[in-house]
Amino acid sequence: TGLELPMFTRKTRLVGVDLSEPMLQRARDRVQAESLSNVEGLVKMDAMNLAFPDASFDCAVAPYVLTVVPDPHATLDELARVVKPGGEIVLVNHIGAETGPIAAIEAFMGRHAASLGWRPEFPWRIIGDWIERREDIVLTERRRLNPLGLFTLARMTRR
């Protein structure tokens, strides 16, 4: 939908990717309505198979993506591939609780949310395991975001 596009400074050149044409159209409408001249493109593309050359970007930002793609590791591999050495990968995602009543609620919701393509029980270990197996990725920040800590910000640097 391009919801995050206006949050970047106008000096930041942006390319947006989505597999959904209706979501891309909403982003195009937002770009036009808010005169976001720094958005260089909005492209229909699969996050697990990006058509960009290796090391194309200084930073890849993937908000609310990993819980909706079929293969989060393939998506993370693609993000790492298109980011230049020294560049960053920035994720914002809901990370499920690992224990307690919230974990039980998320597991229940997960059984019903799967048809929507969303996994409320998405565990951190999917990202953590990926980072551990990648010698070229370093986790530089991980923190819960307000409100209520429902989302987690993770920043990684590609060596």
Language model regions located:
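A short glycine-rich, Lys/Arg-flanked "PGG" loop and its adjoining helix->strand segment in the class I
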Residues: 73-85
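A short SAM/SAH-binding and catalytic strip from SAM-dependent methyltransferases
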Residues: 59-71
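C-terminal lobe and adjacent flexible extensions of AdoMet/dcAdoMet transferase-like proteins
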Residues: 153-159
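A short acidic, Gly/Pro-enriched loop at the edge of an enzyme's catalytic core
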Residues: 45-59
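C-terminal alpha-helical "lid/dimerization" subdomain adjacent to the S-adenosyl-L-methionine
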Residues: 92-152
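Short glycine-centered segments of the SAM/dcSAM-binding site in methyltransferase folds
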Residues: 13, 86-88
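Class I SAM-dependent methyltransferase SAM/SAH-binding core
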Residues: 1-49
